[in-house]
């Protein structure tokens, strides 16, 4: 027996100049939701055209598969997606990343499934921990001298990363919710990445060397 709730949205022409839905924009957003909620199945259909479009999205791997999707046209330098997650109280954070052989940096961050294009505390926590861990690991395996230090920008060269945090009282900066301001999330993400990335590099030294090379 099928059950559930159906919600219908109809744009008010008095409020919006354009009341025609853009299928590609909606499709992109639904894909994000499916990636951010592992196992959730979303079906999107556009029945307006003579040849209707329909797609079902479900990603058991969650943000791991999101990173794979973002790197689909790139050449990763390591096959394994680095994944870390943790909780503290009512807050949860997960991070997935992979390096490719290009130079550009791509970090997509989300808070309660809301895209934060200007970053915020969750991105700050990740960047700080990534730089600290890679420098410490580089010195440990003698790829860096004691006085050498890799800059944060260099640590993120060729990086594709997705950060997703869930929290009960998200504090967004600005009306567009473009930036997350919860300082406790910076600490949570920093601690997760610091602990789990260090352990990952110890268990996968070949990946660590590829990243640092």
Region locations from a protein language model:
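GHKL-family ATPase ATP-binding module
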Residues: 1-213
